[in-house]
Amino acid sequence: MALQRTFSIIKPDAVAKNVIGEITTRFEKAGLRVVASKMVQLSEREAAGFYAEHSERGFFKDLVAFMTSGPVIVQVLEGENAVAKNRELMGATNPKEAAPGTIRADFAVSIDENAVHGSDSEASAAREIAYFFAATEVCARIR
């Protein structure tokens, strides 16, 4: 097992439902440590830049509109196999297909408003973390 960092977004729908603490608690109970966290209101430019890989997809405009519809929580999580662990906790992208007890099964209502985002690889995590956090904003958790 390897100590990794991954990136997480608690999306506008989950922030509006006031379940930020419940979601973060799930990360922590699974052995992931929050090493950076902040609430941000994404601009269209920021959201479009973050999701640029989807810019040619039919859902892109709706995705950008959703991600700018309210504040989000961006976080860096650290732990053993953090990328895979976070993806397991989130559940399937479509909450109707997500296993019971996963974040999306419990808090999401649709594939479009699915509560959370998580990096899909270590390379994506590094890129996504750098998009939102300066190196000085990510804190070592040695205690």
UniProtKB/Swiss-Prot annotation:
MF (Gene Ontology): ATP binding; metal ion binding; nucleoside diphosphate kinase activity
Broad enzyme group: transferase
Protein EC: 2.7.4.6
Enzyme active site: H117
Subcellular location: Cytoplasm
Reaction it catalyzes: a 2'-deoxyribonucleoside 5'-diphosphate + ATP = a 2'-deoxyribonucleoside 5'-triphosphate + ADP; a ribonucleoside 5'-diphosphate + ATP = a ribonucleoside 5'-triphosphate + ADP
InterPro entries found in the cross-reference section: NDK-like_dom, NDK-like_dom_sf, Nucleoside_diP_kinase, Nucleoside_diP_kinase_AS
SUPFAM superfamilies named among the record's database cross-references: Nucleoside diphosphate kinase, NDK
GO terms for cellular component: cytoplasm
Top-rank taxon, per record: Bacteria
Pfam families (alphabetical): NDK
Cofactor(s) the protein needs: Mg(2+)
UniProt main location, coarse: cytoplasm
Function recorded in the entry: Major role in the synthesis of nucleoside triphosphates other than ATP. The ATP gamma phosphate is transferred to the NDP beta phosphate via a ping-pong mechanism, using a phosphorylated active-site intermediate.
Subunit note: Homotetramer.
Record family assignment: Belongs to the NDK family.
Name of protein: Nucleoside diphosphate kinase
Species: Stutzerimonas stutzeri (strain A1501) (Pseudomonas stutzeri)
Taxonomic lineage from the root: Bacteria, Pseudomonadati, Pseudomonadota, Gammaproteobacteria, Pseudomonadales
